[in-house]
Design a protein with these regions (language model features):
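PLP-dependent class I/II
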Residues: 1-153
Length: 153
């Protein structure tokens, strides 16, 4: 699932050939009808307005999540993300205080319906990644569940 609609401008013929071969091998080089219309929409005035509104929603979600974590989850820390909708949450102190592993914490979140991601593949030994590109009501519900059933259970 997903839209294929990116493009590139490469002036170096050798690099262009390598890029085209890689695109062909990946299978992600062919546009479909939905991708074409999405790309056209993205460059329209309405697409710009939509992107502006999306940035506002994501910024609000980031503000909410960062403030919530700092005020409610003792032993959990993070930096405010810049230019992304993903949180990178450091749980090392919380895990040590509760004698738990990251795998146990990840499972606790999943068990209460919070979909989050192991941060170890991103060089965070006790980190969790969390996507905030969703409606505010869902972000609030996720943090309510984490507060009630995971971090302050």
């Amino acid at each position: 699932a997903g839209l294929v609609g990116s493009y590139h401008i490469i002036y170096n013929p050798t690099l262009l050939d390598k890029c085209n071969r890689a695109a062909e091998l990946s299978g992600y080089n062919n546009l479909n009808v939905l991708s074409v219309h999405a790309l056209i929409g993205a460059y329209s005035a309405e697409g710009g307005q939509w992107a502006d509104e999306l940035r506002q929603v994501i910024a609000g979600n980031v503000d909410f999540a960062v403030d919530y974590i700092r005020n409610h989850f003792n032993g959990v820390s993070l930096f405010r993300p810049e230019g992304t909708y993903m949180l990178f949450i450091d749980c090392a102190n919380w895990l040590a205080a509760h004698g738990m592993t990251l795998d146990e914490l990840l499972k606790m979140g999943w068990d209460v319906g919070v979909v989050w991601q192991d941060g170890r593949p991103f060089h965070g030994p006790a980190h969790i990644r969390m996507n905030l590109a969703l409606p505010r009501s869902r972000v609030e519900e996720a943090f309510r569940r984490l507060d009630t059933y995971v971090f302050n259970a």
